[in-house]
Amino acid sequence: MLTRKQYELLRFINERLKEAGVPPSFDEMKDALDLRSKSGIHRLITALEERGFIRRLPNRARAIEVIKLPELSQAASNRRGFTPSVIEGNLGKVRTSTPALDDGERPVAVPVMGRIAAGTPIEALQTRSHTISVPADMLGNGDHYALEVRGDSMVDAGILDGDMALIQRNETADTGDIVVALIDDEEATLKRFRRRGASIALEPANTAYEVRILPPNRVKIQGKLVGLYRKY
């Protein structure tokens, strides 16, 4: 599934290709998505390419080919506004309540365990305060919990201050996953996980913040992001 920003960029590129026969420039993409820097566009394009939605053609400037578009159900949901919303795994599909619910859409109570920093790491609160209800098929298998996002270091990934991050408990992660990382058993942060040689990189999605490079013995994975819960 695509994040909202990824979907908006894919739609913008596809519409420009249909209208003009050439893809938009990075500056045009940045302005269309209201991003502050072109580095955010680079990350979005890389994510779209990794997911098989676009292909960058070698040795040609501004050469981007749209290979496929999201399913109609996701495209329609990304265009609607509502309260509250749930954004599915990797922040793609948005669902609203419907008159008839099948088993996968029936709400599941997810405990809210505290706050998580999307910025400078803060202490992760581990006391269950309340629950939020999300459709069962948004979570998948495993044990899940929610953390309230504080900070703006992941805005280019579509994660905003005040969002509820839906987390699947997990002690391992693949490169590129957005994870809850516990640093030195004291501070927790929400960042993109990558391996760099023998080290671990915790990457923000905001150029105002720096990548943190840490040895593995200082980082514990507490879970992987599978979705967002947002009220408008």
UniProtKB/Swiss-Prot annotation:
Entry annotation: catalytic residues: 153, 191
What processes in GO biological process is this protein linked to? DNA repair; DNA replication; negative regulation of DNA-templated transcription; proteolysis; SOS response
Q: Which residues fall under the DNA-binding region feature?
A: 26-46
Q: Could you confirm whether the keyword Kinase appears in this record? A: no
Q: Which Gene3D superfamilies match?
A: Umud Fragment, subunit A (2.10.109.10), Winged helix-like DNA-binding domain superfamily/Winged helix DNA-binding domain (1.10.10.10)
Name the InterPro entries for this protein: LexA, LexA-like, LexA/Signal_pep-like_sf, LexA_DNA-bd_dom, LexA_repressor, Peptidase_S24_LexA, Peptidase_S24_S26A/B/C, WH-like_DNA-bd_sf
Kindly give the SUPFAM superfamilies that the UniProt entry links to this protein: LexA/Signal peptidase, Winged helix' DNA-binding domain
Q: Which GO terms describe its molecular function?
A: DNA binding; serine-type endopeptidase activity
Catalysis performed (reactions): Hydrolysis of Ala-|-Gly bond in repressor LexA
> Pfam families under this entry?
LexA_DNA_bind (PF01726), Peptidase_S24 (PF00717)
Q: Is the keyword Transcription in the record?
A: yes
- Enzyme class label: hydrolase
Q: Which UniProt keywords apply?
A: Autocatalytic cleavage, DNA damage, DNA repair, DNA replication, DNA-binding, Hydrolase, Repressor, SOS response, Transcription, Transcription regulation
Protein family according to the UniProt entry: Belongs to the peptidase S24 family.
**What protein name is recorded for this chain?**
LexA repressor
Species assigned in the record: Bradyrhizobium sp. (strain BTAi1 / ATCC BAA-1182)
Q: What is the lineage of its organism?
A: Bacteria, Pseudomonadati, Pseudomonadota, Alphaproteobacteria, Hyphomicrobiales
Q: What would be the name of the gene that encodes this protein?
A: lexA
